[in-house]
């Protein structure tokens, strides 16, 4: 229901951001280290790639039919990295995207993304940023960022 107005404006991807309003670690009980690393990486990615979003590491997304038909999202990772890759794909394929404010509950918070997995995820993000930049420059393409027609 809340996404209807966005799709009426022809958005291809809607992202749920925990950072669009107040700090989620204060409002929702988000662990500070999780907030801090997400915020730093999201700000870095936004500035480096000129993608106007407040959060890049969220699983809350709604895709349009146009997105599903144009983007090779099935070539993306099947873990946490998927969320980041599809945002980069939306930018790569010049699709229209926006974000809405969401909240999350961290009561009884548990995650499978421990410190070592978090570090691996961070390295994977830098790899995907590099892949995105190389593909945009037509230097090197891959199955996530294929050569455009």
Regions found by a protein language model. Name each.
Residues 22-27, 48-54, 91, 97, ...:
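Low-complexity, flexible helical/coil segments
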Residues 8, 66-67, 123-149:
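Terminal low-complexity segments of carbohydrate-biosynthetic enzymes
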Residues 70-71, 93-97, 116-117, 148:
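Alpha-helix boundary/capping detector
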Residues 84:
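DNA-recognition element of transcription regulators
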């Amino acid at each position: 229901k809340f996404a209807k107005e966005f799709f009426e404006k022809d958005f291809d991807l809607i992202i749920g951001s925990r950072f669009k309003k107040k700090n989620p670690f204060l409002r929702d009980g988000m662990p500070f280290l999780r907030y801090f690393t997400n915020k730093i990486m999201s700000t870095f990615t936004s500035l480096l790639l000129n993608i106007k979003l407040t959060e890049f590491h969220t699983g809350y997304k709604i895709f349009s039919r146009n997105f599903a038909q144009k983007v090779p999202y099935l070539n993306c990772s099947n873990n946490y990295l998927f969320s980041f890759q599809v945002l980069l794909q939306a930018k790569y394929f010049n699709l229209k995207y926006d974000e809405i404010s969401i909240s999350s509950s961290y009561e009884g918070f548990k995650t499978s993304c421990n410190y070592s997995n978090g570090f691996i995820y961070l390295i994977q993000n830098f790899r995907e940023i590099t892949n995105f930049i190389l593909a945009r420059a037509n230097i090197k393409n891959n199955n996530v960022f294929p050569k455009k027609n």
